[in-house]
């Protein structure tokens, strides 16, 4: 069986780029979360900025992609953060040599003996102290450091003398709000993780959100999160469990970057068709949108397959595939728990007529279950639930 590899095409995100570049050009003050549904273009957006929009003479980017890395213990976390080297050069000398050829670094350079000491001591204090010193050296060279962590939720439940995520957020607060030393961007497609950050008393006035979701244009108000976290306090601590939907402090703004709206999706189809030396009728484009909506990766998949397949066959297969996956999912739920199955079906029936609904229309445990299974996506700031894609939505309507 062959594997179709799809490279995300970058298209029409100028408003979001302008927003992020404006943030980068200013003094570091907040932690920024870039989030959205699966395959909405978060990483493509960041890569466009890193590779084509930043001046390498002014900025040094450390990009940590946790997507394909299994992190279960302290040593795994350290290996993600650092890039070991041997020799007498200082970290800043190594960085300057590498950055001439690469737009970003995938680890912070560290001498082998120093790394060995950090492995032995197994404390984040030494890790963060070393990173801070490197970042300060970069600033002394007249450059602005930027830290980007992709799929941050992968360390959400990891413990190192308490929950690592709290240690990390406290450190990021120090880098941004206190020292104004480094810009920090965290990417996540896990809307439950974002909801936990949003609802559980973290990072008051220290964080802002950038929503990579349906591309509807424009800006919307952003809502900060309540009090500063304490290291070692677990998610779900009863002392932290209070609702913060109505915040007293509303500062900053976030950008809607999501799956393309219809107008942008149709333009994207034209763009891809031109690249592939093919033509699409208005009826073709309407049909594609009705099946897959504005999900960039699905539009790319359709256009790519048009080189050797009929459009109706492509779309019918994609819908059948999504429908069968949903049917088998529901079958598994029913066999495991009949009562849960009934509640899940009742919840999904709410999407028979509407693509988006208010989050509290579905009981918390049921919506979290469906979000974890990548059936639904939650925007906790707007309080909106929707299927992960038009394709999933069409499958829901067909099955139920």
Curated annotation (Swiss-Prot):
<keyword id="KW-0547">Nucleotide-binding</keyword>
<feature type="binding site">
    <location>
        <begin position="36"/>
        <end position="43"/>
    </location>
    <ligand>
        <name>ATP</name>
    </ligand>
</feature>
<dbReference type="GO" id="GO:0016887">
    <property type="term" value="F:ATP hydrolysis activity"/>
</dbReference>
<keyword id="KW-0067">ATP-binding</keyword>
<dbReference type="InterPro" id="IPR003593">
    <property type="entry name" value="AAA+_ATPase"/>
</dbReference>
<protein>
    <recommendedName>
        <fullName>Uncharacterized ATP-binding protein MJ1301</fullName>
    </recommendedName>
</protein>
<dbReference type="InterPro" id="IPR027417">
    <property type="entry name" value="P-loop_NTPase"/>
</dbReference>
<comment type="similarity">
    <text>Belongs to the archaeal ATPase family.</text>
</comment>
<dbReference type="Pfam" id="PF01637">
    <property type="entry name" value="ATPase_2"/>
</dbReference>
<dbReference type="GO" id="GO:0005524">
    <property type="term" value="F:ATP binding"/>
</dbReference>
<dbReference type="Pfam" id="PF21690">
    <property type="entry name" value="MJ1010-like_2nd"/>
</dbReference>
<dbReference type="InterPro" id="IPR036388">
    <property type="entry name" value="WH-like_DNA-bd_sf"/>
</dbReference>
<dbReference type="InterPro" id="IPR051667">
    <property type="entry name" value="Archaeal_ATPase_domain"/>
</dbReference>
<dbReference type="InterPro" id="IPR049081">
    <property type="entry name" value="MJ1010-like_2nd"/>
</dbReference>
<dbReference type="InterPro" id="IPR011579">
    <property type="entry name" value="ATPase_dom"/>
</dbReference>
